A protein has these predicted regions:
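Extracellular glycan-recognition regions
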Residues: 1-93, 97-100, 114-119, 124-134, ...
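Short, surface-exposed beta-strand/strand-loop-strand elements in extracellular ectodomains
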Residues: 105-110
């Protein structure tokens, strides 16, 4: 609704895309507001598409910084999570103002092998003159690689000039995906000259004498652990030498969901899963304690035990943990057995991100899943 603002959307004029593509904020009266995003294109023809996109994560141009640019721009480490995840739904309303038929696809781009962008398209939607359509697309599996762009591709089988209006685009739903180190970096020692991502990683342990690609999947997580290593199949080797450390990712919109992970405890005093995280001082946690306790905790600028039960803990054992949130009811499962549940009746956290927590030691996990 802000005049002149394009909300971060940009025209992609790279490769063989249509160079005569322009976008602007325009007046458009509808049930939801008075503005829309207008995309004008000239000389659209077969094989030459008009594309526009918005960044949803670490911008691609940052991966191409030279050393001097890095020193100027990356004074602070990049901290942020993607805004789009596999399994979520994209909903959008598009109005064609073109006198010939056009075809429109939604697409995403994710960081894959070599930190290069890989593209996934939706099905094709045909628009005739002055046609309005509401379309939906479920984001496909990106194999644990972070999504960094969301966009539209406009095509035609014949030469045409015209415009479309995007009334809205909405991202909704809980992801259905597994977070882990992507398979293409199982052996992640690779020479690269594109950029030195080591300088962009905060709290991520990478040996100084080696240069790695494929660290962008870790940048999708916010963390305050002392070290995070990912050797072999272990995606999440989290070390906090003193006090509590976390890694988390996701969106503040996520409400009712479950998180699962098989976790091994190595001399940690406590560790487990985090749900509905709204920051380092606001979250729920399911934690196994070295004192033979299982807890559901609430961190609200101070740790509060919502429920505690006895639990026979063995160090260096793997435990399959599942933590569920359904409105204000919280349930904790160990090895698929419901062992603890509680209702938070006071100032409950209604939504938030997912993650892991470790206290005074190390925990290890191959992957974390949400659905």
């Amino acid at each position: 609704e802000m005049e002149t603002s394009t909300q971060g959307w940009m025209v992609d004029k790279s490769n063989d895309n249509n160079q005569n593509t322009f976008l602007k904020n325009c007046e458009h009266i509808s049930a939801i507001g008075k503005r829309a995003l207008e995309i004008n294109f000239n000389n659209l023809t077969k094989g030459i598409n008009s594309e526009l996109y918005v960044n949803t994560f670490f911008p691609e141009e940052f991966t191409r910084l030279n050393e001097q640019q890095e020193m100027m721009l990356m004074v602070y480490s990049f901290v942020g999570c993607p805004t789009v995840y596999s399994g979520q739904k994209i909903k959008t309303e598009i109005i064609s103002k073109t006198k010939k038929n056009i075809k429109i696809k939604l697409f995403i781009k994710y960081y894959g092998e070599g930190d290069k962008l890989f593209k996934l398209d939706s099905e094709e939607f045909l628009f005739s003159e002055n046609e309005t359509k509401k379309i939906e697309w479920t984001i496909p599996d990106t194999l644990s690689n972070p999504i960094t762009q969301l966009g539209y591709s406009i095509a035609s089988d014949e030469q045409v000039s015209g415009k479309i209006l995007i009334n809205y685009i909405d991202i909704s739903g809980i992801p259905k995906m597994t977070f882990k180190k992507p398979d293409h970096i199982k052996n992640d020692k690779v020479n690269t000259t594109s950029h030195n991502i080591k300088s962009l990683t905060n709290g991520v342990y990478i040996p100084d004498d080696e240069k790695y690609y494929g660290q962008l999947w870790k940048l999708a997580w916010v963390n305050d652990v002392d070290k995070w290593y990912s050797y072999g199949k272990n995606s999440f080797g989290l070390i906090k030498n003193a006090s509590r450390g976390h890694v988390f990712t996701g969106s503040s919109d996520w409400k009712n969901y479950s998180v699962t992970s098989k976790i091994m405890f190595r001399l940690a005093s406590s560790g487990g899963l985090v749900i509905r995280s709204q920051g380092l001082q606001r979250y729920y946690s399911l934690e196994i304690k070295s004192t033979n306790k299982l807890q559901i905790n609430k961190m609200e600028y101070g740790l509060k035990i919502l429920k505690e039960v006895d639990f026979s803990f063995e160090p260096f054992e793997e435990y399959f943990m599942r933590f569920e949130a359904d409105n204000n009811f919280l349930k904790g499962f160990i090895n698929n057995e419901l062992l603890i549940e509680v209702e938070d009746k006071s100032n409950q956290f209604e939504n938030g991100m997912i993650g892991c927590i470790v206290e005074n030691g190390t925990i290890i996990s191959d992957e974390i899943s949400i659905n």
